[in-house]
Amino acid sequence: MSSKAFRTQIENRNYLSSIGFKFNLAKYPKVDFFSNSAIIPQLTLATAIQPTYLKDIDVPGEKLSFGDFTLKFLVDENMENYMAIYDWLVGLGFPESTQEFKDITTDSADQRDLKEAFCDGTLRILNSNLREIAKVKFQDLFPVSLTSLDFDATNSDIEYFTADVAFKYTVYNIVDTKGDPL
């Protein structure tokens, strides 16, 4: 057998674990510590139709469509991580006044910058030894939904709150630990 054949075979036979991940948002560091579920979004390529005499044929050539990025996180006792997302979402929707939008789109130098409404995020994928092996880098994230917190005094066991947040974004890339494409 040639040495070339050995290079094309799988070297690591361990399987990727669903519990091996960490997520962080550049502007909101309190959210990452409590994350307990994340979904790498669906990626869909629409097709163009090439008409032919017998049958229309699908061919690649349309736009890529990225699904929402959803994250489930444990809500801390002071609700700091929940309120970070809540305030961000309310600021984007400005339900009471346009000042809320101005507050979220003003940078630390008191200059208007619409990029302040967005935030980059990184999902770090870990191996079976909990060492980082890859990153999913999301560009220009912004929240579009945040689940409710349902208080219930009839629960006999202590249940800790989790919240789901859905983000829209521009694009995501999967890179190695150095930032190079896989």
Cite the ranges covered by each PLM segment.
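Glycine-rich, low-complexity intrinsically disordered segments
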Residues: M1-L182
